[in-house]
Amino acid sequence: EIWEYAKADTLKGEYMLRRGKDALKLKLKEGSMRIGQKNYTVSKLTERTLPDYPTKDESDFLDNGNVGGKVTLRGRIVNVPKGHEDRVSISIPDPLQTIFDNELPIECDSLGRFELDIELANTGVVRMLWAKLILTPGETYFISMDGQTGQTFVMGRDSRLSNELLTHDTPYYKVKSSDFDKKSDAELMEAVEKDYERVKEIWMTTEQASPMLSKRYRLLSRWQWKMGAAYSLVQRRYDSPDVRKSDDGQLWQWLRDSVFSDIARPYTLVQDDLAYTFDNYTSELLKPRNSGGYSFEFIEEAINIAEERNQADKDSLAILSQSMNDYRSKVNGGTPDSLLSDHPFHALIRQMFANGTPLMQIIKSTEPNERILLKNIPRVRDLDLSEELKQLSQAVAIYSQLEQMHGPLSDALRKVLDETVMPPYYRDRILMRSKYFADLAAKMKRGNGCLMPNEPLADLKDGKEIMDWILEPYRGRIVYLDIWGTWCVPCKANLKQFTKPLHQKLRDLPVTYLYLCNNSSDKAWASAIAEYEL
């Protein structure tokens, strides 16, 4: 609890504290403290974090089954670090988000004190300035932070693990998948095993030096390394065609045996990277990589939609489909990429999916993605995963589609959601996000942006010519140019995280902000600029 000083005699070490109508006497002297009528032996904290706890703790993590619950945070932050003066916040990973964390502002009074309630699905990790905290629904925590000294303490019944993490940082996965862009999966997995041997040494050294570290610390340290490795490894889905052909299943088998068959309990402990990692892992199981680099399933759905709606010449669509099937059979048959570089399928893709074509308009609508999703969600039931992870996979897939569409649930997705078994917390998160986009659409104002007409640019092919035409009205001004798309997840992450701080930092300069969005539907574009306040 936070108490106010009513009286203070620092020379005698005597204090009177008040909280509402309650009063408390406090007397301090070297090595002892008297609170009310009770005496305590104390020692002054001079280090940045607490020393190791003197007793063993073999308790397990509390798992509430992802029903959600409130966590109360109280505390004081002094000497706020540079760059955070205008906004101190707490970052809460969302178990269904593949990229964004939820950030909540912390309102401090003139003395740096704060009180905040947050909702968590389950026991999990949050970040507050430089501190990584483990919080459990139903608990109250008091946090003391000093941005100048870095001194950080957490108090409360469930504070031990947070203090241990502040004192003993956990080792992270250090293999860069990008260093293996032209190497086989087997070579990458050899590097993973070497990194595992490295962290085993760190764990052994740390636990020998600090034998009282809790069981929960030991478990979390291992789970976090494995999830860091998994997050990096699943990105092999996007590597070069040559790498894709080297896939012997070893990488995906390791993920199954070492990560998803022995995942953290509760898995919200590793939710920082879990949604993205798991989404890619299940996508690989449902739609394995191919060495051709194309999403044939996606192209097929776009062709099907165009045929159903008579939005493109049927003969042209038939030629594209026939060429794709020929190309796909050669890819699956192991034909070297060098012999496929002149295949007519490449030219057909460039021609029929160019800007302004019917197929490109269909892609912008995100409808092909939704059709694939509707087919794949039932297929998740057949995957070799625990029931808990199957439900997570389905929830992440639906939530990710909302983010991709930047709009509310379609009728088809809502029907699938109603028919899919998942924890109520997941369902509520999806429905809340859908309502958010629906409300955003209802109050959207188009005054912040305008559609660029295609006609003046139709005959321009050179990139410099196109950019000169776009920038001509702003010549002589300072222009900040950002090119993005509603389909581009990193673009949207940067817009969400950096737009407001950038505008604030440059507020005294005569800057014109120009955000160019391409290959995106009008609806998704309008929704995104409203959300990010562009």
Regions found by a protein language model. Give the residues of each.
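A non-transmembrane, solvent-exposed segment enriched in polar/low-complexity residues
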Residues: 3-216
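Acidic, polar-rich low-complexity tracts and alpha-helical solenoid repeat scaffolds
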Residues: 53-60, 68, 442-455, 508
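Oxidative protein folding and maturation machinery
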Residues: 149, 156-472
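Short, internal strand/loop/helix patches
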Residues: 362-363, 526-534
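C-terminal substrate/ligand-recognition segments
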Residues: 457-460, 474-479, 487-491, 505-506
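Conserved redox-active cysteine motifs that mediate thiol-disulfide chemistry
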Residues: 475, 483-501, 520
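Conserved helix-turn-beta segment immediately C-terminal to the redox Cys motif
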Residues: 477-478, 495-517, 530
